[in-house]
Amino acid sequence: MGHSVAWLLLVAAASTLAAEVPTDVSMGLLAEPQVAMFCGKINMHINVQSGKWEPDPSGTKSCIGTKEGILQYCQEVYPELQITNVVEANQPVSIQNWCKKGRKQCRSHMHIVVPYRCLVGEFVSDALLVPDKCKFLHQERMNQCESHLHWHTVAKESCGDRAMNLHDYGMLLPCGIDRFRGVEFVCCPAEAERDMDSTEKDADDSDVWWGGADNDYSDNSMVREPEPAEQQEETRPSVVEEEEEGEVAQEDDEEEEEVLDTDQDGDGEEDHEAADDEEEEEDVDEIDAFGESDDVDADEPTTNVAMTTTTTTTTTESVEEVVRMFCWAHADTGPCTASMPSWYFDAVDGRTMYELMYGGCGGNMNNFESEEYCLSVCSSVVPTDMPSSPDAVDHYLETPADENEHAHFQKAKESLEAKHRERMSQVMREWEEAERQAKNLPRADKKIVIQRFQEKVEALEQEAASERQQLVETHMARVEALLNDRRRLALENYLTALQQDPPRPRHVFSLLKKYVRAEQKDRQHTLKHFEHVRMVDPKKAAQIRPQVLTHLRVIEERMNQSLGLLYKVPGVADDIQDQVELLQREQAEMAQQLANLQTDVRVSYGNDALMPDQELGDGQADLLPQEDTLGGVGFVHPESFNQLNTENQVEPVDSRPTFERGVPTRPVTGKSMEAVPELRMETEDRQSTEYEVHHQKLVFFAEDVGSNKGAIIGLMVGGVVIATVIVITLVMLRKKQYTSIHHGIIEVDAAVTPEERHLSKMQQNGYENPTYKFFEQMQN
């Protein structure tokens, strides 16, 4: 009897609770009003009393293309609520059994979409929970009225600037339909995020949910109230099983009807072939949702062309796994010949969206009709700051030098350039976006925008140059220390071999060669360091030039003294005299090569006051006495001369500020990354591997000077044409000058009088005697 009374009381309490479900959000609803759309499917909305997703009441409404239309649809499906605005949800949700229009039953299909929240009554900002070690922040811009996506990006970047992850966020100050003037957000450290994730996993089986015991059948409804952490996140839907104990009678009836729909032979059991056919047909319907574009406006910004899968699990972990599987799929247009612009999410390239011409079928499912929804779906499962490898530059600067110094330096150099390229790419994208937004601005405002980005680019270039200079100087100092250690060790071994009793000449000569090679590398490092400083900072090079020459003289003296010790040991120098002479010839040859190399370098950079030809020649004469045996600054061993990328070589960089290399103005939009040439800041090629800095070059205004090579060729061609015209004109004038008028050939007798001779000349020039002419006319 007691059990019956308890059961009746429980039923009465449940009935009372159901009857008292309020219709005003301020009084509390079991679920927040939301609508979800998937083109080709019937619109879905949440039943605020049960928390379940239900299809459109009319069974005809599908995806809507405008925010005003979405607001109107919210008002239609929730007539009892005062819907005043809509806003995108922060997280995608999974909806089970979402059928295409015209179908009543479908199973085992989960669709992941980003729903719209229908805001009730006067706007009230979301109550965000701030866990331990987290920070609550907000930003408002009264002169801006931006979308949900814009403010989500602002919050995400703000957390990233603080080396934290975006935990939760909400909109502030509505200024239109799905438009706002600010955002509030919570940033948490990565460790706190992981702790909260583990706490949520432990609480997955909990039935605590604001609204009652119906949470087993709810679908990821977002309740934004100041509740505990496990209530702040999406509620965990569970799998609905046919044999679950305590299942309500209504669910049993629906399951029986579904089995009967697939029971074609009347045996009372589900026909698996029919079910498989239905699933295959549903798969075709889903492909049509991606492939058919005739019925869908490509410009609809709210079309949730999301992703589908054939799994029955609906835990939050499985939803994130499905989203990750599709969002991380590689770009594939498919075999079909359609050409539909879409967006795909590149998780490898810094969570960036790229445009993709989707073929309509057979391609990857990672394609979205707008960048907005691509980011909304895919960014939910990607942390704000993806785990990145430790900064190689910091690691290099903090780690002491070892035998792998050159390899560590190369790795740090590549990391530095990659970071610089990433920064420049980000600025380029921001510049292009600002350019698009500034098309209708006055010319003065455009100039301000251009100047701001010019300053930003220049600051990035100067920062990168400073970091490069620090990296190279550190590498030079470490190489010098390593060379000193090697030289000291080689000299100690050489002296030890000389002091042996009796000494072994061949062994002594071998150690002497090692010591000489160490001195050569020290000298080569010193010269390269001076050339680098002379290139990037001539004033500093002028200051250190005396120290460089002194160091080279010290190297020469040490080598001469070491060779002198060889002749103090009886019998050793005589046994290896031939090798010593060969070493002397190599010294002379390498000295000449070094002199030529120095001359070439000086000419390539232009004659300057630091290293004039005559002065350097005198210095070489002083430092390279030919009568010395192994001494001389110019001595370079064949095994180490002009050797590429050895541990003793330092590769100079161009660390000059940007204004010395040309300041960019603005990027040109619409160019592929392959078409954008590389901006290469490089030093002269001095027969050694040099520090070449490659990054993507911003292509700027047309007034920037183009290729000088084309201008030179044009001038040369023009000069040749002008010279040809002048020559032809002179020839023609000269020919005309020597041309005379002749009406015939007249023989002149040498015995005639001067008067007759003069008359003959006049007749040659066309003179006619009027008397003769008169009589000729009379006779005729």
Swiss-Prot record:
It is a single-pass type I membrane protein. The record marks 171 as: Required for Cu(2+) reduction. GO terms for cellular component: cell surface; early endosome; Golgi apparatus; Golgi-associated vesicle; membrane raft; plasma membrane; recycling endosome. SUPFAM superfamilies: A heparin-binding domain, Amyloid beta a4 protein copper binding domain (domain 2), BPTI-like, CAPPD, an extracellular domain of amyloid beta A4 protein. Residues 392-583 form the E2 domain. Its main location: membrane. Residues 733-780 are cytoplasmic. This is Amyloid-beta A4 protein. InterPro entries: Amyloid_Cu-bd_sf (IPR036669), Amyloid_glyco (IPR008155), Amyloid_glyco_Abeta (IPR013803), Amyloid_glyco_Cu-bd (IPR011178), Amyloid_glyco_E2_domain (IPR024329), Amyloid_glyco_extra (IPR008154), Amyloid_glyco_heparin-bd (IPR015849), Amyloid_glyco_heparin-bd_sf (IPR036454). It is found in: Membrane. Functional neuronal receptor which couples to intracellular signaling pathway through the GTP-binding protein G(O). The keyword DNA damage does not apply. Glycans are attached at residue 560. PROSITE patterns: APP_CUBD (PS00319), APP_E1 (PS51869), APP_E2 (PS51870), APP_INTRA (PS00320), BPTI_KUNITZ_2 (PS50279). The gene is app. Disulfide bonds join 39-63, 74-118, 99-106, 134-188, 145-175, 159-187, 327-378, 336-361.
